[in-house]
């Protein structure tokens, strides 16, 4: 059963008057705001009547705006200490966590292990573009000069080419948005006297085969090198010297240890990086030419038909080789078929 509404006290009763016709109106009395009395516009309606009606105990007043202690502390912090983070008024990050011991910004104070990595400034990207495109320096040499990863240097050059092409085509650029974002991020400025390394450029990828422990018998008279260690883990494992993004730096450091003059070591390093990039460019050009030669083009008035020869037997050991015929259009995988092994059968 629903709860019964208790009777209201006598001091909160509504006085009803004999309202006749359309001349009656309802006016507020001196009772509380949620209690009102109905009185007639005639002078006789001001007399109290013997009929009294009990009012409901439900209140129609607005609830009091009572804040919890945590909410009060939150607004107090926003008005005092938090006001410094409301608007960005300086160059560089303005984060709540401040900076860590290594000088990197910490966005989240409760997670000091998450660091905000710096980005290349607009001037730094222009310097990289000029060194590669105007001065003709090899990409690996620019990467070693400014301690910027080779892939990042290549990305900067491509984006700069697009930007300059858009400027020539009079396309609008989001300059205000870029300035607002760059103003809030830590930046690396290249070319200055106190230039700092932007990132590590010789991080080596750890292959899963090299994480296991091996016991290899080696004679005392034999010199066990990094190439021998890589061959012990597998014939397809490359040594560390060949895994680096800029392996020419190893020979450069060896020349410095041999007390070769710095200018001579720099000249040899530039020649080695230029020869390496020329070899990569030649190999890529041959690959593209081979792909182009394998395609027969037949042009019509409306379309261009491209024919390429395929061997239907080259489908791989499971019939799903990525270079096989029809791989692009796909074959349904047997994942939902019965008697199919869906769990790994070996550990790699």
Swiss-Prot record:
Composition-biased stretches (Low complexity):
37-57
Instruction: Name the domain of life.
Output: Eukaryota
Recorded hits in Pfam families, A to Z, give: Bot1p
The UniProt annotation puts the region (Disordered) at 37-63
InterPro entries according to UniProt? Ribosomal_mS45
Q: What's in the keyword line of the UniProt record?
A: Mitochondrion
Q: Which GO terms describe its biological process?
A: mitochondrial translation
Q: Which compartments is it annotated to reside in? A: Mitochondrion
Gene Ontology terms, cellular component aspect? mitochondrial small ribosomal subunit
Q: Which family does it belong to?
A: Belongs to the mitochondrion-specific ribosomal protein mS45 family.
Q: What does this protein do?
A: Component of the mitochondrial ribosome (mitoribosome), a dedicated translation machinery responsible for the synthesis of mitochondrial genome-encoded proteins, including at least some of the essential transmembrane subunits of the mitochondrial respiratory chain. The mitoribosomes are attached to the mitochondrial inner membrane and translation products are cotranslationally integrated into the membrane.
Q: How does it assemble?
A: Component of the mitochondrial small ribosomal subunit (mt-SSU). Mature N.crassa 74S mitochondrial ribosomes consist of a small (37S) and a large (54S) subunit. The 37S small subunit contains a 16S ribosomal RNA (16S mt-rRNA) and 32 different proteins. The 54S large subunit contains a 23S rRNA (23S mt-rRNA) and 42 different proteins.
What name goes with this protein?
Answer: Small ribosomal subunit protein mS45
Organism, scientific name: Neurospora crassa (strain ATCC 24698 / 74-OR23-1A / CBS 708.71 / DSM 1257 / FGSC 987)
């Amino acid at each position: 059963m629903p709860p019964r509404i208790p009777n209201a006290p006598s001091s909160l009763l509504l006085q009803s008057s004999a309202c006749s016709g359309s001349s009656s109106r309802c006016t507020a009395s001196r009772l509380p705001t949620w209690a009102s009395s109905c009185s007639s516009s005639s002078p006789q309606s001001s007399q109290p009547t013997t009929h009294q009606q009990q009012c409901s105990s439900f209140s129609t007043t607005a609830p009091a705006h009572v804040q919890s202690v945590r909410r009060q502390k939150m607004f107090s912090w926003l008005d005092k200490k938090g006001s410094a983070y409301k608007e960005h008024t300086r160059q560089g990050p303005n984060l709540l966590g401040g900076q860590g011991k290594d000088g990197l910004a910490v966005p989240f104070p409760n997670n000091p292990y998450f660091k905000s990595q710096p980005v290349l400034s607009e001037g730094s990207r222009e310097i990289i573009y000029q060194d590669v495109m105007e001065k003709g320096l090899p990409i690996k040499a620019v990467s070693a000069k400014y301690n910027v990863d080779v892939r990042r240097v290549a990305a900067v050059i491509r984006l700069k080419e697009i930007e300059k092409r858009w400027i020539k085509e009079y396309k609008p650029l989001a300059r205000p948005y870029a300035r607002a974002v760059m103003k809030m991020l830590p930046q690396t400025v290249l070319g200055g006297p106190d230039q700092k390394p932007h990132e590590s450029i010789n991080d080596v990828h750890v292959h899963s085969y090299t994480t296991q422990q091996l016991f290899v018998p080696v004679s005392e008279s034999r010199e066990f090198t990094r190439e021998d260690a890589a061959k012990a883990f597998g014939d397809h494992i490359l040594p560390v010297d060949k895994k680096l993004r800029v392996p020419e730096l190893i020979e450069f450091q060896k020349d410095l240890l041999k007390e070769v003059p710095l200018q001579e070591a720099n000249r040899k390093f530039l020649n080695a990086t230029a020869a390496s990039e020329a070899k990569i460019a030649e190999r890529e050009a041959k690959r593209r030419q081979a792909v182009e030669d394998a395609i027969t083009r037949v042009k019509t008035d409306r379309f261009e038909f491209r024919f390429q020869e395929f061997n239907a037997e080259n489908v791989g050991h499971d019939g799903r080789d990525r270079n096989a015929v029809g791989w692009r259009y796909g074959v349904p995988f047997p994942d939902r078929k019965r008697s199919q092994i869906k769990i790994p059968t070996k550990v790699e």
